[in-house]
Amino acid sequence: MRALRAGWLSFRRLHLAALIDDWRRTLLSAIGVALGVTVVLGVLILKSELVRPFDAFGPSLTHAADIGVVEVTPNISGRLPTETVNRLHAEVAGAEAVIPIVAALTPVDVAGGSHGFFLLGGSCQIELLVGSFNCEQRARDVQPAAGPGVPLQMPEAIAQRHGLRLGEEVRIPGLPPGSAHLGWTFPEFDRVEGINDGYVLLAPSTDIAASLLSSPGYATSAFVLPKPGADIAADVDRVIAGVATAGPPRPHLPAVFEGATQSLNLIALAGIIVGVLIAVNTILLAVEDRRAVMGTIGAIGAKPVGLFGGMLGEGAVVGLLGGLLGVPSGFLFGTYLLDRFGRSMLAGSGGTIAAHFTPNLIGIGAAAGIVCGIIAMVGPAARLLRDGPLASMASVGGVQRARKIPMWPLVVGVGLLAVAVVVLKIFERGSLPLNVGINGLTVALCGVVLVTVWIAPRGARLLIELLTFARPAVGRLLGADIRRYALLFAMSAALLAESTSLAIGSHAMQLLGTVQIAEQKAERLPDALLISAQSVLDQRDGRLSDSTFELVAGAADGRSVSSRWRSTISSGASSRLVVGVTPGDWYSQALYEPTDVPDGFWQGLREGEIGLSEIAASRLGVSTGDTVTLPTVEGPKQYRVAGIVRPQMVNDAAVGDILLASEGLARSDWAAARDQVAVAYPSAADATAHRDDFLDLGAGLWVYDNQEWRSVATNGITRFLEPFTIAGYVVMLAAGLSLLNVFVLGLVQRKRERAALRAIGVTSGQEQAVIVGNAGILGALVACLAVLGGVGSPTSGRWAHPCTTASRSNGVCCRFRCGQRWQPYSLSS
């Protein structure tokens, strides 16, 4: 205790007192850290709120259940056979209850508007998961209100909020008019408040919900509640072997959101890097002014380890202050991102989101700030320790000698870039998981920072030599300034280059992807109408029921009609999309292009073989003619690979790992549901003239001719990629503000130098020219490095091939002209 007390006393007198005495510089340093923390918190809020609706499938749904709940999730998404559920009931002796559910997030048209709901079907045993709401008594004693279709139930508070009365029709996209209505309401809103923000529709049974969601005979998942003290893991695993997996309840994220969260992680990391670099720059200036004092303290007997620890403590204090300052602005920034972009990213998904302030944000902000502050202080503190007290005492007045950037940042930076290139070249073929690609981008950004640190001062000297020919006095002063503050200049350039590269890369991907995807239908299916229950890149599994298809076929009036069927083999970020088509018809040939002989490929699909996208084949390690084992609704089966295909149009799931099969095989082995219908017309004008025939069916359909596809696809891809672009520019803005902070600190720091320069005849105009020249050279260097790092970085493409994105999970390729060559790049993960 005595040692701790002595250490605290020393820290308070030497370090805290210095921070308080120089409060202006301390505040500016903390503001710099707060800018980085603001970016981190804003992105983390967006990320957490985007995934919150998908907690409805697991964590939110089981909030009232006892500890030990096991969720059984099928290998084929949303397709847990009822036979498996029955076996769980019969063969898991230690289970108190087995609760199957059928659920989906879906937009619902209610009271003249559209809102996202969590459609949930199950027995009254659901009360064991969410808490009691008198389900059995209400089902027994209260008759549902009369209305069209099946009766559904929702919280009374939600019905009142939207002015929805009992008996009114509830329309779900993909179902014909008159399919469902509001039959009951219940007042126990607190039971479902955490599930999709309370926007829940309860179906009377799993069978009814399955019919609404085109999955009869299957449950979405099942929850097994163990008896007290019972261990059910082994029995559950035995029953579900080959069909499903078991574990604690977890969110069911769309595959594209797995990739989005990884990208948001990258932006959050960029915010941390910005915060560290901001703190490094501001703390460098603050420490330089106190080096002589600290050297004197060391010379009169202070232990070097104690001084080093005290300096790190100073960094932690400045970081803590900056982190706390960044919490309110971070929450406001996160709320803005959520309102501006989060809702558009979830449009059509059925998810409902809102910003939630939690005490955890304070802890995260404080922790991020402390990390920034400590990392920023390590360099100056280590140098103070390395130089010793005498050298530090001789540094009164600031930096006394030219600084040199060592060679190691260049060597390490180039090494990191080389590693990123190799990893992303492998990743681009699809054989590595998505998180490896994101980690590769992170490594590349770190490489950009280190290379910039080495290049910036040397590049500045070349530009200064040119300036010296025109303005000798200004050039010499500027050269001396850069040499003395080389590290500060290098870190400032690295800060701006890293943030600007992120912004340029994100914007390039958005612009290129938007233009190319908007023209896909006109190029592949110009004379057809595409009919779907969801918009382009809506994050849900849209479906067209059999009764809706009959309406569509009738409206087609004898024209050629073809369907696409879809299911998903679930494995998180590496989910595999199963697509069923009529092999070799006009629609399938427009969507998928075999790499080998087309006739042989389509014949193979007719005979029960499968096709794989290049990414799927790479991940499975197979080629044409090989046999591969794949999960099905009944367990693993073997299939012969008929060939490799290239997808030609973006799919709504934005997944490039695709298995192509005949319609019959997709329905029997993977329980695929119809998700899109194409109707052929003699011309594009004729197709446009018949759009209203399908819109008037009242089934909530999206009907695409060329112009509608161009408009909706542009909005879809923009709303999905724009948040990353804006976040990149926000990081860049934070970096720019931090440099303004550094310039202000620098002017305060060098007041003695400016007085000395005035004494030897330097005019105020020359001094101003030096400041402008410093900023101009910094801007010119950063512009060059950022363009190379943005257009050529893995954020918009592989580092070695500037036009090819590393996010190679979508099989759809767009093209970007580089010189005279066209390079493919895939749109999104």
What are these regions (language model features)?
Residues 22, 277-319, 396, 738-780:
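Interfacial "coupling" helices/loops that link adjacent transmembrane helices in transporter permeases
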